[in-house]
Design a protein with these regions (language model features):
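Bacterial Sec-dependent N-terminal signal peptides
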Residues: 1-22
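General secondary-structure propensity
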Residues: 8, 202-205, 468-471
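A generic structural signal for short, non-catalytic loop/turn and secondary-structure boundary residues
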Residues: 11-14, 82, 111, 527
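Short helix-loop boundary/capping segments at the starts of domains
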Residues: 12, 222-226, 269, 273
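Short linear Ser/Thr-Pro motifs
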Residues: 15, 121-123, 425
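Active-site core of glycosidic bond-cleaving carbohydrate-active enzymes
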Residues: 239-543
Length: 543
């Protein structure tokens, strides 16, 4: 069967499914959902209190123009809060969970409600930037400011919303002149399913890299809730692209593989009727996918996550149970293939995410991502004894690799180009290397050439930067990979990060995809992978 015929057959199968409303995995989904529910992790709890009261300082040399100065140990507990008026507290590190506080009347009787405002924030600038009028492209509701009206003092109050923060500002908005009151106690119940680190660093590990590993691990831990969340400040949900990177980092830190299994089954249980996975699944307020959010690159990387899970655990039962889901993702992706073995990104509307970089041409990297997915899926099939079901994959890989080199590799310039404008980007080089389209020698030259060209589109964030370092390691550019990791993630540490950020450009502290930088997550899953590189390659990063 040639590629044109194969694609036509697969497209007809998909069309039949959509036309007649049949659910590809209807008989399997109830069992998958039950496995997902049975593997829901227990959250470990830790009670924390603030370590200092702080004062905001506007400082152009600080990240995003703000920093905090310590005022010492908080001592407001016995004071009349009407005299305190406002206080900002530092809990010492990024934490996720639930906030409780207690108030008491100091004299007379409460004759009117008390109104308090609580502002929780991850970074100093977020805490000190006016939120209104709202400019963000995501919901104003994601910001962690809460107004509480107390009609009955002398009791504990727990805010129902889960918070993710380091700093807390408490403001008195309204009270009666007829009585005084104090906030005499408060605490935070931090939660995570991570457990303890299982992979200690070598004693030879340099302090700078040790600190990067610590922050990386803290980032992953905060995102490990009842699913691998992408960032606990905003969505209580699981993204497939983030899950792949989190599973790699988890291997060299907490080794909580049951959580990976839980997440794989959640995706499968909520697959679309056509058998294709949604890009993300909600964990809260109730389980379910974000309908309509289909990202082909994330569908394909789910297969790689399943493969890596099998390698980590030897859980052949799960891999075999979910094999048909992996196979279906490839079937769907193959409907985008042209007869000349090139992935056609214009075959039908589709979201292909590699980076937030504006103007990024994804033709070359999508060709490579498809090759990489075919390789990983065939390896998965071979490991579970299903290679005969996809015996055409090796030939497809060979044909697509040949087509990729012809269409996208400029032999004279020794670089990968993409699209009608022959765009040069770092990601086009890295994905061609990851897919094995370029040899290590060719890959080294391509990366060097791309980095030397001032017109090259660079990665705009940690997700894409992960793949650059991955490509450098594949090509044997060990020293350059180490330098890049220390420069990039170490740059965040030097700017005060205690967890790694969703968006980071060393030359643009205000970078945001949401038109308002306080919406950015300062603890984000796709930024946790230094611990993967540091753990996997100790001879490069720990000596």
């Amino acid at each position: 069967m040639n590629l044109r015929t194969l694609a036509a057959v697969l497209l007809s199968v998909a069309s039949f499914t959509l036309l007649y409303g049949q659910d590809y995995f209807e008989s399997s989904k109830p069992g998958w959902l039950e496995i997902a529910r049975s593997t829901t992790p227990v959250l470990h709890e830790e009670i924390l209190r603030p370590v200092a009261a702080v004062r905001a300082v506007q400082d152009p040399s600080a990240f995003q123009g703000w920093r905090y100065e310590s005022l010492g140990t908080p001592d407001f507990h016995a004071k009349n809060f009407k005299e305190v008026g406002e206080i900002t507290l530092d809990f010492g590190r990024h934490i996720t969970g639930y906030f409780s506080f207690h108030t008491k009347v100091l004299n007379n009787s409460q004759d009117a409600p008390v109104k308090l405002k609580f502002m929780f924030g991850e970074l100093p600038a977020e805490m000190n930037t006016p939120l209104d009028p709202w400019k963000g492209t995501l919901s104003r509701g994601w910001m962690q400011d809460e107004i509480v009206t107390l009609t009955d003092m002398d009791e504990w109050v727990t805010l129902p919303r889960r918070m993710s923060f380091r700093y807390l500002r408490i403001e008195l908005l309204g009270s009666s002149a007829g009585f005084d009151f104090a906030i005499d106690d408060l605490f935070f119940k931090a939660v995570s399913s991570a457990g303890e680190n299982q992979v200690p660093l070598l004693e030879t590990c340099p302090e700078e890299i040790r600190e990067i590993a610590r922050v990386s691990e803290a980032t992953l831990k905060e995102c490990m809730q009842t699913v691998f969340e992408d960032g606990p400040k905003r969505d209580h949900r699981l993204w497939s692209g983030d899950l792949y990177l989190q599973s790699l980092a988890n291997r060299y830190s907490f080794r909580n593989f049951e959580l990976v299994k839980h997440c794989l089954y959640m995706f499968a249980a909520f697959a679309g009727e056509n058998g294709v996975l949604w890009s993300n699944v909600y964990d809260f307020p109730k389980w379910g996918p974000q309908y309509g959010s289909y990202c082909l690159t994330y569908c394909l990387i789910w297969n790689s996550t399943l493969l890596e899970y099998l390698k980590d655990t030897g859980d052949y039962q799960t891999a075999t149970d979910l094999w048909k889901v992996a196979k279906r993702q490839i079937e769907d992706a193959m409907t985008y293939m042209r007869p000349d073995n090139i992935f056609d990104i214009n075959a039908r509307p589709v979201w292909l995410f590699f980076d937030h970089r504006a103007g990024l041409d994804v033709n070359a990297m999508m060709q490579a991502a498809m090759i990489f997915a075919l390789k990983d899926t065939y390896e998965l099939a071979t490991m579970i004894g299903c290679a005969d079901e996809v015996k055409e994959y090796p030939a497809l890989v060979k044909a697509m690799t040949k087509a990729a080199r012809k269409a996208y590799y400029d032999k004279d310039k020794e670089i990968v180009v993409s699209g009608p404008g022959a765009q040069v980007s770092i990601l086009s080089q890295t994905w061609m290397i990851k897919a094995g389209v370029l040899s290590p020698k060719e890959g080294r030259k391509a990366i060097v050439n791309a980095l030397a060209d001032p017109e090259t589109l660079m990665p705009s964030g940690p997700y894409a930067t992960h793949y650059l370092i991955d490509a450098m390691m594949i090509c044997g550019m060990h020293e350059q990979a180490r330098e890049y990791l220390v420069d990039y993630w170490g740059g965040m540490v030097r700017k005060g990060a205690d967890t790694f950020w969703e968006c980071y450009d060393p030359d643009d502290d205000m970078l945001t995809p949401y038109s308002f930088f306080p919406l950015n997550s300062a603890c984000h899953a796709w930024s946790c992978t230094p611990t993967y590189f540091i753990g996997k390659y100790p001879e490069v990063f720990q000596k």
